[in-house]
C-alpha cells in the first residue's frame, strides 16, 4: 500500500502548520480528477496517509496543499494561493515524503527518502 507523508512548516513564524488541508487526486486519462484522500495536518504539522489503488501501471496524481486557507489574501500583488505537485506513482509499497516550508509569498519543498 503506497504512503504519502508530509511535514509542513511556516517560514514566517517558525511554527508547525496544523489543520492544513492536503488532498491527493488521481488524474484520469479523460482529464477528470478522482480524490483519493483529503486530510488535515496534525498539531505537529504532519500528515501520513496510506491508500489502496491499482498501481500495475504508472498513474499520475496531484498532491494539493491548501495554503490559501492559512494565508488569506491580505496584500495587493502576487500571493501564493495553493501548492500543487504532480507526481507519478507505480509501486504499491512506495513511500513518498514531501516536507514543505511555506509563507504567503512562496514555498520550498523537496522529496525526502525514508
Describe the function of each predicted region.
Residues 2-86, 90, 97:
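Beta-strand-dominated extracellular/periplasmic modules and repeats
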Residues 93-114:
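Compositionally biased low-complexity segments at domain edges in trafficked proteins
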Amino acid at each position: 500500500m503506497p504512503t504519502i507523508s508530509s511535514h509542513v512548516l511556516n517560514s514566517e513564524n517558525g511554527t508547525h502548520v496544523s489543520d492544513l488541508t492536503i488532498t491527493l487526486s488521481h488524474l484520469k486519462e479523460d482529464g477528470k480528477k478522482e480524490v483519493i484522500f483529503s486530510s488535515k495536518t496534525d498539531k505537529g504539522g504532519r500528515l501520513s496517509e496510506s491508500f489502496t489503488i491499482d498501481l500495475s501501471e504508472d498513474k499520475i496524481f496531484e498532491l494539493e496543499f491548501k495554503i490559501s486557507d492559512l494565508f488569506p489574501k491580505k496584500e495587493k500583488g502576487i500571493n501564493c494561493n495553493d501548492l500543487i505537485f504532480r507526481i507519478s506513482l507505480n509501486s504499491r509499497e512506495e513511500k513518498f515524503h514531501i516536507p514543505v516550508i511555506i509563507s504567503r509569498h512562496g514555498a520550498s519543498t523537496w522529496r525526502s527518502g525514508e
